[in-house]
Regions:
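PRPP-associated nucleotide enzymes
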Residues: 1-186
Length: 186
C-alpha cells in the first residue's frame, strides 16, 4: 500500500504530527520529574503503543528499561469481546519495580482493567498508566490513567500505531478512518 493509498483511508486528521510530538515531550518531562531518583520499567502494550513508547522513552531524562505485553479483547472484530487474553507476557520480573504501562488508547477500560489487576498481583513497587489517547465517553469501567496525552471523541482512529485491519499504523499522525471504510456498526 502506497503512502497515497494510506492517506486515502483517512477521513480527517485528528491530531497532527507536531502536536503529537509536543505533547509527548511534555509527558516525558512530567514523567522525568515524577520518577526522579527511581528507575522506571516501561511496559508497552503491543502492537499499538510501539510508536508512542519509542518517542516517550526518548523524551525521558531518567533511567528506564522496557518490556512488552500483548493482550487482546478484540479478536478479529473492531468491538471488544470482553474476553481478555495475554498473547505475550513480560520477560522481566516486576516485583518491587516502578512500572509504567504505556498504552496507545483507553477505550472501554475492560482490557486495561484486566491488565492492571494482573500486573498488581505481581507486586510492583508502583504501577501507573500513561495513555496517548483516551475516549472517556466509551468507558465501561473506571480505570485510573495518571498520564494522558489527549482526550478524544468516540471516533475510529488510526495512525501513529493505531490500526484498522493491521493497516495505517505507520501514519505519523492520528486520523479518523474514512467513513467509506468504516465497518458496519462502528
Amino acid at each position: 500500500m502506497s503512502q497515497a493509498e494510506l492517506e486515502q483511508g483517512v477521513g480527517d486528521i485528528l491530531i497532527g504530527e507536531e502536536e503529537l510530538q509536543a505533547r509527548i515531550r511534555e509527558l516525558g518531562a512530567e514523567l522525568s520529574v515524577d520518577y526522579a531518583g527511581r528507575e522506571v520499567l516501561l511496559v508497552g502494550v503491543l502492537k499499538g503503543a510501539v510508536f508512542f513508547m519509542a518517542d516517550l522513552m526518548r523524551s525521558l531524562t531518567i533511567p528506564c528499561e522496557i518490556d512488552f505485553m500483548a493482550i487482546s479483547s478484540y479478536g478479529a472484530s473492531t468491538d471488544s469481546s470482553g474476553v481478555v487474553r495475554i498473547l505475550k507476557d513480560l520477560d522481566i520480573n516486576i516485583e518491587g519495580r516502578h512500572v509504567l504501562v504505556v498504552e496507545d488508547i483507553v477505550d472501554s477500560g475492560l482490557t486495561l482493567s484486566y491488565l492492571m489487576r494482573n500486573l498488581e498481583s505481581r507486586e510492583p513497587a508502583s504501577l501507573e498508566v500513561c495513555a496517548l489517547l483516551t475516549k472517556p465517553t466509551r468507558r465501561e469501567i473506571d480505570v485510573p490513567v495518571r498520564y494522558i496525552g489527549f482526550e478524544i471523541p468516540n471516533r475510529f482512529v488510526i495512525g501513529y500505531g493505531l490500526d484498522f485491519a493491521e493497516r495505517y499504523r505507520n501514519l505519523p499522525y492520528v486520523g479518523v478512518l474514512h467513513p467509506d471504510l468504516m465497518p458496519e456498526g462502528v
